[in-house]
C-alpha cells in the first residue's frame, strides 16, 4: 500500500506529458480543477464509508471462532474478557486497566436479541453501537432488553424493554469496573449472570449457543486489513454493507455527491469512475489521510488545564464524517462524553515533553467530580501507546488504589522510573517519553467547569 518515489514520479510525469501534449493553457487549468475535484470526492467517499467497513472487519475477526473464548466468540455470543491488560498487551493501543469488557457482535436482521443486564454493586454499563459506530443506547438499569432493528414489527414479552438500532449489525460493549486482580472473581460472577439469546429462544425457554466457524483468512488485524484494501475491494464492501446497514437520512446530501463514484446504497462501484491512474490516486489519498485526520481532530479538541480530550459529537457523530473516521482509527467504540471523557497530557506545567529521565509530581487538588457509581484513574503509557513494564506491575492509580492523601484531601502522585522510598503513591514510567490519560467515567459535566484539573510539575 506504500507509494514509492518511483510511483509518485510515474503518476506526476504521466499526467504532465498528457496535459502538455494535448491541452491548451485554459484547458490545462480546467483539467487540473477536474482532477482536484475527483481527488476530493474520492477522499470524501473514503472518509464517509471507513467506519462501516472497519466495523465489519472487526466483526469478522472477532467472530472468527468455533466456540467462545476470552477474545473471540461466534455471532450473537458473549466474548467475556478474563483479565486486565498489562505491559504485554498488544491487541489495542492505550488499553484500559479500570474495567473488564464483555463484548458481542449481534445480527438482528432476522429477530431481536434479548440482552439481560444483572443487578450489580458497581459501575456497569452496556454501550450499544450501530454499524456506523454511533451509540444507539447505553444500558445501565438491571433488566431485560430487546436489541431490535428499528424497522422490526412484532410483540415483545412483558417486562422486556425495546432498544431500536438502525442497522442489522450491532456491537455491544459491557464495561465492568474492578479494584484490581483480587476483584476478578466478583467480576466473573457478574459476567455469569449476563444473558444473551434470540427472542425466539427466550420465548421457548432456553437456548444452546450454536457452533461458529473458523477461517484462517479472517485472522487479521482489522485496521491493517482495511487500510490494505484497494479502491474496488473497499467500496464493494461498503456498498454491500449498506444494503443491511442503511445510511442515516441526514446522509442524503453527501450520498448524492458520492453517486458520481457509484458509492452508496444500491450502487455498484466501478473503479473506472476514478479516471486515469486510479490506483496511484488511491495510494496518494491514503498517504495524505493522516494529515487530514490530524487537522480535523483539532476542531473537536477540548482543553482542560494542561490536558486535552476529544469532545462532542464523539460517539454520536451525525454528519461529522471525518471526525467519525479519525475516532474509528484511534479508538473504535468510543463513549459519548456523558459516559466518559479521556483527557490526555504529554507535557508538564511548563509545556515540556514528559520523559522518564526526570521525576515529576502529579498534584490532584480534588477528585474529578463524578455522578453515582462514577470513577477516575490516571494511566501512564510509553511512546508506543502501550502500558509501561515496571517491577510492581502497576500501570495506573485511581480512586480505588488506597492512595495517601494530604491533610487538605489533595493527592500527590510521583511519576518516575526509579521507585521512591514509599511506593504507595508511585506511578512507574519508563526511560523514554511518556504520556498520561486521565479517565473520568460518569463525569458531572456541570461541576467539571469549576473543577481544577491535575497539574504535572517536574521535581
Describe the function of each predicted region.
Residues 2-7, 16-33:
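N-terminal twin-arginine translocation
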Amino acid at each position: 500500500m506504500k507509494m514509492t518515489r518511483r510511483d509518485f514520479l510515474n503518476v506526476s510525469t504521466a499526467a504532465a506529458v498528457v496535459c502538455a501534449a494535448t491541452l491548451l493553457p485554459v484547458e490545462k487549468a480546467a483539467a487540473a480543477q477536474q482532477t482536484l475535484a475527483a481527488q476530493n470526492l474520492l477522499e470524501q467517499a473514503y472518509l464517509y464509508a471507513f467506519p462501516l467497513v472497519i466495523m465489519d472487519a472487526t466483526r469478522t475477526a472477532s467472530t472468527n471462532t468455533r466456540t467462545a473464548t476470552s477474545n473471540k466468540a461466534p455471532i450473537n455470543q458473549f466474548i467475556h474478557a478474563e483479565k486486565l491488560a498489562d505491559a504485554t498487551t498488544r491487541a489495542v493501543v492505550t488499553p484500559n486497566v479500570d474495567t473488564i469488557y464483555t463484548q458481542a457482535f449481534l445480527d438482528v436482521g432476522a429477530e431481536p436479541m434479548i440482552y439481560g443486564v444483572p443487578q450489580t454493586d458497581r459501575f456497569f454499563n452496556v454501550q450499544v453501537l450501530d454499524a456506523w459506530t454511533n451509540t444507539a443506547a447505553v444500558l445501565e438499569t438491571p433488566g431485560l432488553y430487546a436489541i431490535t432493528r428499528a424497522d422490526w414489527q412484532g410483540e415483545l414479552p412483558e417486562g422486556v424493554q425495546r432498544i431500536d438500532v438502525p442497522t442489522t449489525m450491532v456491537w455491544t460493549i459491557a464495561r465492568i469496573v474492578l479494584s484490581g486482580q483480587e476483584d476478578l472473581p466478583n467480576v466473573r460472577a457478574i459476567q455469569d449472570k449476563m444473558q444473551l439469546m434470540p427472542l425466539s429462544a427466550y420465548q421457548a425457554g432456553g437456548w444452546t449457543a450454536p457452533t461458529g466457524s473458523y477461517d484462517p483468512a479472517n485472522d487479521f488485524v482489522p485496521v491493517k486489513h482495511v487500510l490494505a484494501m484497494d479502491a474496488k475491494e473497499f467500496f464493494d464492501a461498503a456498498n454491500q454493507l449498506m444494503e443491511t446497514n442503511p445510511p442515516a437520512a441526514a446522509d442524503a446530501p453527501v450520498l448524492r455527491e458520492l453517486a458520481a463514484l457509484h458509492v452508496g446504497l444500491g450502487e455498484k462501484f466501478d473503479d473506472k469512475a476514478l479516471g486515469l491512474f486510479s490506483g496511484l490516486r488511491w495510494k496518494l489519498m491514503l498517504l495524505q489521510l493522516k494529515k487530514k485526520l490530524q487537522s480535523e481532530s483539532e476542531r473537536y479538541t477540548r482543553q482542560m488545564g494542561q490536558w486535552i480530550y476529544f469532545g462532542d459529537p464523539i460517539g454520536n457523530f451525525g454528519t461529522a464524517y471525518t471526525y467519525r473516521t479519525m475516532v474509528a482509527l484511534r479508538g473504535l467504540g468510543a463513549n459519548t462524553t456523558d459516559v466518559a471523557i479521556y483527557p490526555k497530557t504529554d507535557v508538564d506545567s511548563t509545556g515540556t515533553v514528559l520523559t522518564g529521565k526526570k521525576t515529576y509530581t502529579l498534584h490532584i487538588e480534588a477528585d474529578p467530580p463524578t455522578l453515582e457509581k462514577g470513577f477516575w484513574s490516571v494511566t501512564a503509557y510509553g511512546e508506543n501507546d502501550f502500558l509501561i513494564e515496571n517491577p510492581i506491575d502497576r500501570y495506573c492509580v485511581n480512586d480505588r488504589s488506597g492512595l495517601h492523601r494530604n491533610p487538605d484531601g489533595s493527592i500527590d502522585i510521583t511519576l518516575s522510573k526509579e521507585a521512591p522510598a514509599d511506593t504507595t503513591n508511585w506511578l512507574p514510567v519508563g526511560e523514554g517519553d511518556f504520556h498520561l490519560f486521565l479517565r473520568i467515567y460518569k463525569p458531572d459535566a456541570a461541576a467539571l467547569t469549576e473543577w481544577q484539573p491535575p497539574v504535572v510539575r517536574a521535581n
